[in-house]
């Protein structure tokens, strides 16, 4: 079993030293969902929300969050991201919005936390913008979909997950 990388021999939290690692292209994809009433989703889709374009605002929030992950998550390295993508898709058949993010860089450490943070903050932004019309929306299923690059190798969720 793998060891926790952010815990030293004394059991204390520490930032991992990545100075000796090789720079490689690293990429991660994550997703999150915001489930809501059909009326709330229709308001977003139809552009009838009084606060403006919910998807555009959530997209910008997700991108900004990925760039600030190091400031939000203890022990994360500040990264020079070369790409952050936040895609939002209304799924009326499930009364939800699906958020999928992608982060990429050439560097010494992975971008999983950046992709997850982007998805989470985009979901939180949708909640924030819509809470006046529905407070019982559910943010859920935030997860890593795939990662590539780095010493630990590639990861991809199974198709049936």
Swiss-Prot record:
EC number(s) stated in the UniProt entry for this protein: 4.6.1.17
Molecular functions per Gene Ontology: cyclic pyranopterin monophosphate synthase activity
Active site: 128
GO biological process: Mo-molybdopterin cofactor biosynthetic process
This protein's record includes keyword Lyase: yes
Pathway: Cofactor biosynthesis; molybdopterin biosynthesis
Pfam families: MoaC
The keyword Lyase is assigned to this record: yes
Binding site for substrate: 75-77, 113-114
Enzyme type, top EC level: lyase
Signal peptide: none
Keywords: Lyase, Molybdenum cofactor biosynthesis
CDD domains to which the protein is assigned, alphabetical: MoaC_PE (cd01420)
Enzymatic reactions: (8S)-3',8-cyclo-7,8-dihydroguanosine 5'-triphosphate = cyclic pyranopterin phosphate + diphosphate
Family the UniProt entry places it in: Belongs to the MoaC family.
Functional note: Catalyzes the conversion of (8S)-3',8-cyclo-7,8-dihydroguanosine 5'-triphosphate to cyclic pyranopterin monophosphate (cPMP).
Subunit annotation: Homohexamer; trimer of dimers.
The protein's name in its UniProt record: Cyclic pyranopterin monophosphate synthase
